[in-house]
Amino acid sequence: MLEMIQALDEAALLWIQEWLRCPVLDTFFSAFTQLGNAGLVWLVVSGGMLLFPKTRRAGFWALVAMLFGLLCTNIVLKHLVGRVRPWLVVEGLTRLVAEHDPNSFPSGHTCAAFAAGATWARYAKKRWLKGLCIAQAVLMGFSRLYVGVHFPSDVLVGCAVGLSC
């Protein structure tokens, strides 16, 4: 079963590299994925939300969700599982950004994006804003695949952990 998942993961990454990569998207996704480094964008937005009474609760619970996600993904699962990054094992895969953590599973960027985005969406009053909250999380997850630093299964589990927080 794990061999089949690994084969599908590798095929998906090579397909993205072969059929979707282009200079415009390379620039966009390389920049977008960097927004998630250290959870900075979600910390800043959630911290800013604490300043306003209408958004204070959403900001607080997003920070709590991200903390739980950080504990699950970056502190426990990454070290417990120890899965190496895709560019180290997928022949022909080129990464577009540097990634210093050698552990791939699960995606911490995706976890934080979904933990924050789902929490913000729960408190958002407008439908378009709910969609935007989820869209940023989906884009972050996809960006991790596009730049070649995570396997699809890493991103899916990061999403699941983020949503469960």
Predicted feature residues:
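Juxtamembrane/transmembrane-helix boundary motifs in multi-pass membrane proteins
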Residues: 22-26, 49, 53-61, 96, ...
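N-terminal transmembrane-helix/juxtamembrane module of multi-pass inner/ER membrane proteins
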Residues: 1-40, 74-102
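Transmembrane helix-loop junctions in multipass membrane proteins, especially transporters and channels
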Residues: 54, 82-87, 149-153
